[in-house]
């Protein structure tokens, strides 16, 4: 019966590594797997599905955080607030399409002034007045 089971004297227990660290992710693969199973989205959940979903969620979070950080820096702030997330999402075409129906609490509205309400430029109005006189 040689080669079966663990040796009696070996105490070299292998350290457990999480699925997140195996995949090189920060988002919790195990927790996402648990949510997928508990949510009854399907009868069975494949082994790769929670890893893939965690990677997608991590990418989206990193993208939003990067754009929101840029918006905060543009406003000379060091802390990201919901307003910066709103500006980041709405100024990005793809994220705006993805989160179009989402309301961000305390995000405010996008700054927009209709072209008809803007003051006319002095140079163009002087040329138009000269053309009317002739």
Swiss-Prot record:
Please give the subunit comment from the record: The nucleosome is a histone octamer containing two molecules each of H2A, H2B, H3 and H4 assembled in one H3-H4 heterotetramer and two H2A-H2B heterodimers. The octamer wraps approximately 147 bp of DNA.
Provide GO CC annotations from the record. Answer: nucleosome; nucleus
* Family according to the record: Belongs to the histone H2A family.
Q: What is this protein called?
A: Probable histone H2A.3
Keywords for this entry? Chromosome, DNA-binding, Nucleosome core, Nucleus
Give the Gene Ontology MF terms in alphabetical order: DNA binding; protein heterodimerization activity; structural constituent of chromatin
Q: Where in the cell is it found?
A: Nucleus; Chromosome
- Pfam families in alphabetical order: Histone (PF00125), Histone_H2A_C (PF16211)
Q: What does this protein do?
A: Core component of nucleosome. Nucleosomes wrap and compact DNA into chromatin, limiting DNA accessibility to the cellular machineries which require DNA as a template. Histones thereby play a central role in transcription regulation, DNA repair, DNA replication and chromosomal stability. DNA accessibility is regulated via a complex set of post-translational modifications of histones, also called histone code, and nucleosome remodeling.
**DNA-binding listed as a keyword:** yes
Does the record's keyword annotation contain Transmembrane helix?
no
Question: What InterPro entries does the annotation carry?
Answer: Histone-fold, Histone_H2A, Histone_H2A/H2B/H3, Histone_H2A_C, Histone_H2A_CS
Q: Which GO terms describe its biological process?
A: heterochromatin formation
């Amino acid at each position: 019966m040689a080669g079966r089971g663990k040796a009696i004297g070996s105490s070299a227990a292998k350290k457990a590594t999480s699925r997140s660290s195996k995949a090189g992710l920060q988002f919790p693969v195990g927790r996402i797997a648990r949510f997928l199973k508990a949510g009854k989205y399907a009868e069975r959940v494949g082994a790769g599905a929670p890893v893939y979903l965690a990677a997608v969620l991590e990418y989206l979070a990193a993208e939003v955080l990067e754009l929101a950080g840029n918006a905060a820096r543009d406003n000379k702030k060091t802390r990201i607030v919901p307003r910066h997330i709103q500006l980041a999402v709405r100024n990005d075409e793809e994220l705006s399409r993805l989160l179009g129906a989402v309301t961000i609490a305390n995000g405010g509205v996008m700054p927009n002034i209709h072209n008809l309400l803007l003051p006319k430029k002095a140079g163009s109005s002087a040329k138009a007045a000269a053309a009317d006189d002739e």
